[in-house]
C-alpha cells in the first residue's frame, strides 16, 4: 500500500487512504502525516480525515484541519457535482474539527472567521454547553435560526418538533434549494428564540453533552443508528 501512496495516481492514493481509514489501520498513521502537505486537495482530505479517525492524540489534528478548511474556503466557486462535493467535504472537515477539539480549547479566532453556518456545525460537534450563548446569538438571524436550533437540540436534547419551542406556523413559500442553509433548514420549524433561550438557562455549567446527556460511547451508539446529522 505504501508503494501506491508514493507512486500511485490521485485516485489510487485516495482509495488507499480511504481503505486505511475504513479498516482502522493505525500502524499507517505516520505514513498519513506525509500527505497533510499534498498539493492535491482530495489526497489531503483523505489523509487528514483518516488520521482524525485513527489518531488517539486529537490535538495533533487541529492545525492540519484548520489549514485544510482554510484552503477549501479559498477555492473559487464550483458548480454542479464538484460544488456539492466541495461543500460536503468542507462541512465534514468542520465536523471533524469539532470532534477533535471536544476535550480541548478550540481555536476561537479561526472558528469566528468561518462562514456562520459552518460555525454552527462546529459548535454542534464540539458538543459543549459553553457554546450555547453563541448559538443563541446566531439563532437571532432568520436565515440561520433553524440550523442553530438543530445544533442546540443536538447538545441539549430539546425536541425540535415540540410546538412549545416553535413560533406559530404561517403560510410561507418554501425556499428553493439554492444554498446549504436551505438544505439544512428544510423541514425545521422556526424556533421561538425567547423560549429556547429560557430553556438553555439550566445549562449554567460548562459540560460536554449530546442530546442532553454526557458524551459516552454507549449513548452515542444508541443514537447514531437512527439519528440525523448536522
Spell out what each predicted region is.
Residues 5-13, 31-46, 50-230:
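Long, helix-rich interaction regions
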